[in-house]
Amino acid sequence: MCEKAKKLVIGNWKDNETDAEKVQKKPFLKGTKSSIWGSSASDISGQSRSLKSSSSVLSSKFVTKRLFTIQHGIEGQKPNFKIRSESFSGPHSAGGFSKSTRESRSKSRSMGNGKFRGKSHLRSSSESAHSSGSESSSSDSNSGSSSDSDSTTGSSSHGSDTGERPRMRSAVFRIHETWQSPNSFKAVKTSRENKESRSRSSSLPQKRFCPSKTQNDLTYGSPEPKSPSNRGRNSWRVGMRTPWKKSQSRSMSCSSIQKILVSRSFTRSRSPHRNTLCYQDQSKNPSRPSNYNTWKQPMDEVYNNAANYRKRHNITLTSWNMRNLPEPVLSFERSGFNATILQQLEDQGYDGPTPIQAQTWSIAKEGKNIVMISGKGTGKTLGYLLPGIMKMHNQRGLMQHKKGPIVLILVDCREAAVMVQREVLYYTNPLELRTHCLLGNSQWQGHAECDLLVASAGRLLQMIDNKKHVVELERCTYLVLDNIDRMIDVGLEGNICRLLCRLRPHAQLIVSSTSWSSNLKRMANKFLGQYTAIRVGEINNIGVRLQNIRQRVEVVNGLSKVERLMKELTAIYDTSDIPGKVVIYVKRQKVVEELVDLIRNCVPCEGIHGGRTAQENQGIIHDFGTGAYNIIVATQMTSNCLDVPGIRYVINYDFPDNIDKYVQRMSRTGCLSYNRNCEVISFFTMANYKLVTEVVDFLKICKQEIGPHLLQLAEEKMFGPRQRRRHRPQRYNRMH
């Protein structure tokens, strides 16, 4: 090859151009249409380029390029066009591709500067002999060879193709890389690709063929996300690349719908970079199963038994992950407890777990946080106690260097702590576990190392705040808050929050309550994290046993409540000499003392409240249970301590602040009294006017009789004009 030919391949024009070269170079200027796409084979051969021969004639070198198949020119002949840089020593073979040397490859990499885009010769193999004969003549005329399909000039497009073609970054891509053919999307592997491992080029990596977006994809695109602006459209559906027409919904047959499904383009994702998921016609391949069948939930025997059990006992589960919830324990043998605990359960005469126990035991063994919501007397104590004892028994040998209990149970009052401690001792003594009960007046024994601690919430939280007593909770991994709704009502929410911050980060929390109030929901979302709520009974906190209690709400004047109370007591004692036990609820301790002095003039009576010591209250409750007196006056604080059978009448002298407390008073007296003939009498005044609609709705749900005065107040609140408060003058700080 002559020096001029090598410079043409490299694309670096160092010699001065002659006038003939400038004239022949004009067809390559921007805006011209000198291209092989619009010319015949004879025109291509006539426009062949002739170069001056040099003294040192190089051997013929071919620069391999993609083989184009274009149907035009001589009839019945498919000319194969090749891009080559050749010497003019003689004819060459028309078939196959010749390999380029390492020198030509290294020189061709320097053509990426954009000065000359490598206008190479496209020659037909059928006219190679004619062109080789004219190679000996040293002509300075340059043929108007066609530019590449990837050229940036305006002449890069032929007559039928008017679209712009992408621009190649380097001459390496031009000589050794393949590009997309206008008639095909197949790539031809060149010798460059076959010997890719031998190449040590520092240029950009080879860009293999990747199917780009077609015109259909650009037209329809990926399904747009659903938003208020396109709510009525059908194109937001996931998996549909084209919108579904509403007219096709009913007027199309199954075969036509199947054809449309085959013709449509379904995708795995909205991302355009994901591969398409094609669906084939099932009629052509009947052995292949359908790919778009929906997943069916397994309906095995275990699942059916668990679902029927929950439906039969009205168990409602609420969790962050409903798929991994275990099935309820239907018998003691499947609970996973050791033989000692099973023997103790059999000795007490239990036949099987209660609904709240069956569902709580299976979830508590997995270490999840639980909220237990059920009425009084449903077995919540054993529901959280037995899993805690098993966890304490398994972790007893661990963390010997740390102090504090492994299981901590907090209750709302002293009497409840005594009851829980009695159950704890019955199951822990055979296992030789150390337990301790911290009551109201007892002192903290720092040297007493216990595995399980039962304490009243007020006393323990008071000792934590006191710097004289150091409460160690390093080993505590199981915390129970029994009757947390009562703790929140008393005002211990802030202290409970400080207690939870002192626990280990992975401690398991069990919360039990008789109601599901808004305060409890807020606290559970704040501290329990991904908890599971187990609810047994009606959603509106009304059990079947509460519906059997007769309820009567009387609208009275606040000044005449004492007279109305005496009339009710007189009517009760007139029916029988032994009418049954009566509990009167009030709000303040002062009112307790006043009513006790008034009623004591007629019949024996006593009162309990938080101002008295625990021994005094416990003695009064014991005498009330034995029958020393049948009337007792109590506050809301001590309502949980009245676990006495035989209570028949409950009088709400002061109506509670909300419906939840109203239900608690009934559940802790009427249901625990084991007396179905219990009656609840409530005095409703204008001070409770804001609760009138809730009270009426509650009575309607319980199917109770509603007085006309109460209905009138409810209608006035709902439909009457809104009453404004009287103007109260503001009090300013005056300087005297």
Curated annotation (Swiss-Prot):
CDD domains: SF2_C_DEAD. It holds the Pfam family Helicase_C. Its EC number is 3.6.4.13. It is an enzyme of class 3 (hydrolase). The keyword ATP-binding applies. Keywords: ATP-binding, Helicase, Hydrolase, Nucleotide-binding, RNA-binding. A motif (Q motif) lies at residues 330-358. Residues 32-58, 73-166, 183-237, 265-296 are annotated as: Disordered. The keyword Nucleotide-binding applies. A motif (DEAD box) lies at residues 482-485. GO terms for molecular function: ATP binding; ATP hydrolysis activity; helicase activity; mRNA binding; RNA helicase activity. Residues 361-534 form the Helicase ATP-binding domain. GO terms for biological process: alternative mRNA splicing, via spliceosome; regulation of gene expression. InterPro entries: DEAD/DEAH_box_helicase_dom, Helicase_ATP-bd, Helicase_C-like, P-loop_NTPase, RNA_helicase_DEAD_Q_motif. Probable ATP-binding RNA helicase. This is Putative ATP-dependent RNA helicase CG14443. It comes from Drosophila melanogaster (Fruit fly).
